[in-house]
């Protein structure tokens, strides 16, 4: 018998050329846990609400949205939705528990805390939540801020300004709002009082000046009118006095000036002197030369005096009527000015 050569100890065993044995060498096992699969998938109701995308971070807003949607439906639907809310809450808790392992290896996937999570996308859900759950703001804060601005113009104390700004910023709460409004109203009253204290003395100084100006104007007008009336009388007395009779019994001279007026034909027209306005008896009768005739003059001038006397009387009456009219008008003006004062 032939002896077979010994086999090496480290030689691998002979493999059969079967497809099963070759495929078994490249097999590998994949284990999938159901919790991790559920964490990667979310239903569409949790991502969209009324056609708008909700914030991607998990928050209690989902339960609020579902409660709002369930309030509009019937009671049967509310019961089913409450059960779904409970299941979704349990699912959220399981997802949060399962996500702790992944966040340890990937810190960037860790969601920020709920206090600072705000989606950059505008959402109607956030507006609804603000409308339902936020207290209404007091509108008096804007008025208080304007009053603090107005008072800061007159006040220079930095402490008071800081106090007003802090009070205006703290009016978000309803309890602090009425107290701040009262403070602003009190500061506005103080500002108005200070303004009136500064303005009153100026007004009191100006008002007597105006009244004194009016009084001086009225008194000056009265004095001017009195001087006009007195001037006529004084002129007449002065002009009546210097009528002097010459030693030879000739003509008397009056200081009324040259009243001669030469016309183209060479004739002269005489007018009455100023003394005739008040005392026509002392003025005498005018001649053609403008000189009055004394009583002791010659008889040849008597015929001329008779012819001129009628015209002079008419002039005197007309002048006296004009003087009376002027006096009446001046008196009326004085009365009107006194009534206006």
Curated annotation (Swiss-Prot):
Primary subcellular site in the record, as a coarse category: membrane
Coiled-coil ranges from the UniProt annotation: none
Subcellular location: Cell membrane
Low complexity compositional bias, start-end: 12-29, 67-108, 167-180, 297-310
Cell membrane is among the record's keywords: yes
Protein name: Probable membrane-associated kinase regulator 1
Keyword Transcription: no
Function: May negatively regulate brassinosteroid signaling.
Composition-biased stretches (Polar residues): 208-230
Subunit comment: A C-terminus-derived peptide binds BRI1 in vitro.
Gene that specifies this protein: MAKR1
InterPro entries per UniProt: BKI1/MAKR1/3/4 (IPR039620)
Region of interest called Disordered, as start-end residue ranges on this chain: 1-29, 67-122, 158-185, 206-230, 288-310
Molecular-function annotations in GO: kinase inhibitor activity
Gene Ontology CC, one term: plasma membrane
Gene Ontology BP term (one): response to brassinosteroid
Keywords of the record: Brassinosteroid signaling pathway, Cell membrane, Lipid metabolism, Membrane
Transmembrane segments: none
